[in-house]
């Protein structure tokens, strides 16, 4: 664990910021995936879900565990589009409340639970464990991968997108491009190979490995537009330095993409 990805700090940050983030960013708290480059943010975010679902071989009516579910956007989308039996977990009580309200408003029966991803246990197993932009927050990622493997049916799928740093990153590049992201977003960035090793050590066979930078970097062009909202900075000042660091990290994310030092990756693995 670095000094940024502390669970209590992460919980507090999302409890404070989620209502504002939703009002600015929409139903989904993740990147968009642009194909033509002309799509709206909302369309691009749905296209990311579809891209991950396709890579994971998602079928109708499957049982999905959405780990780090945010305000429930992906779970609700998958329940409506694929008839998925979706269960979402998050460590933020505010996000659980927001997700339940969103599901009720959409007439979706997805379940949302307050649960630590490193300690998750269920009586049932799932066809798919789905984790979009969440694992980089976890202090002990090895515990998540072990728990995720146990949550899967034999032959089940773990589908991950997450934030990574470039391999063999020089210290100067780390300090300039990666540390501000870790500080503002409360994450610890690994290289993709670290996740691959954890997948293999938990009897999860990698079937898809992809870098999505080309299609997803536009998310942070839009992020910079969000920063032009003066009211947001006034709110941030009221909430303190961590919210300010969070907003400043939007620029760092864009710089990380532009420099090639930040990687947005997709991994899909099957339980052997």
What are these model-predicted stretches?
Residues 28, 39-60:
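Conserved alpha-helix/loop element of class I SAM-dependent methyltransferases that forms part
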Residues 164-186:
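Short, glycine-/aromatic-enriched active-site segment of Class I SAM-dependent methyltransferases
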Residues 65, 74-119:
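Class I SAM-dependent methyltransferase SAM/SAH-binding core
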Residues 208-272:
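Conserved Class I S-adenosyl-L-methionine
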Residues 142-157:
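A short glycine-rich, Lys/Arg-flanked "PGG" loop and its adjoining helix->strand segment in the class I
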Residues 1-23:
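N-terminal auxiliary segments of SAM/dcSAM-dependent transferases
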Residues 187-203, 209:
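Short alpha-helix
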Residues 118-129:
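A short acidic, Gly/Pro-enriched loop at the edge of an enzyme's catalytic core
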